């Protein structure tokens, strides 16, 4: 940073037709762009003098590190100055910011990490990918709904297939969490196709895996 961030922003402007706001030290961003002959057309700069160190306690983002690019960017998102926030920083701090700065959609119990992963055919979305140590069935149902919405609206997948990651394909497999989640997912407003084993993931057997 900031070279690769500027390059990524420039590509997003050219290929996606979006307006990009670069959040960081404005002087360093402009100097880097000039040195590498990168245009800043279609990009705005929101000055943030500091960077959140990955070794810091994630919760310190809110009070001790409000001047960092991560905190400033997420506050801008909360204030309606953007529609999405892209960050390669601390996952823990990002989740703290998402929960307490940006805030969750009303009714959503937990924020989640949702990486889109490649397969032999089409990519799938894994949710949650590591944000939560312990979940309840209703949370997995919410993850399924959010994941389906993402795959449908962003990845343009019609009726995304939702599967529950489990130790076996049969609906009687798993712990109480998986058993109850299966029942609730079957009743949820998603295209639930049942359990899926880890060995099936590379073949693209589902579009959303919870």
Positions of PLM-derived features:
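Short glycine/serine/threonine-rich phosphate/pyrophosphate-binding segments
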Residues: 1-8, 67-80, 84-98, 109-113, ...
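N-terminal glycine-rich anion-binding loop in soluble enzyme alpha/beta folds
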Residues: 2-56
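Glycine-rich phosphate/diphosphate-binding loop of Rossmann-like nucleotide-binding domains
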Residues: 16-30, 133-198, 207-208
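Short coil/turn connectors at secondary-structure junctions
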Residues: 16-18, 40-41, 79-83, 90-91, ...
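Short beta-strand segments
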Residues: 23-24, 44-46, 87-89, 116-118, ...
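Phosphate/nucleotide-donor binding subsite
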Residues: 38-82
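Short, acidic/small-residue loops that bind anionic groups at enzyme active sites
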Residues: 96-130, 187-196
């Amino acid at each position: 940073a900031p070279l690769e961030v500027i390059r990524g922003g420039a590509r997003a402007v050219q290929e996606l037709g979006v307006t990009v706001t670069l959040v960081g030290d404005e002087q360093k961003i402009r100097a880097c762009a000039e040195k590498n002959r990168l245009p800043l057309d279609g990009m705005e700069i929101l000055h943030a003098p500091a960077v959140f160190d990955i070794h810091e306690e994630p919760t310190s983002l809110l009070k001790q590190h409000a001047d960092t690019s991560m905190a400033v960017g997420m506050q801008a998102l909360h204030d309606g100055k953007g529609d999405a926030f892209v960050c390669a920083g601390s996952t823990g701090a990002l989740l703290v910011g998402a929960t307490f700065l940006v805030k969750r959609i009303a009714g959503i119990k937990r924020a989640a990490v949702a990486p889109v992963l490649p397969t032999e055919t089409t990519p799938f979305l894994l949710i949650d990918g590591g944000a939560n140590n312990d979940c309840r069935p209703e949370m997995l149902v919410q993850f399924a709904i959010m994941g389906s919405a993402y795959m449908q609206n962003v990845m343009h997948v019609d009726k995304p297939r939702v599967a529950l990651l489990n130790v076996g394909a049969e609906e009687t497999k798993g712990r109480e969490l998986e058993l109850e989640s299966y029942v609730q997912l079957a009743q949820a407003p998603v295209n639930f196709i049942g359990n899926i084993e880890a060995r099936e993931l590379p073949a693209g057997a589902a579009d959303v895996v919870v």
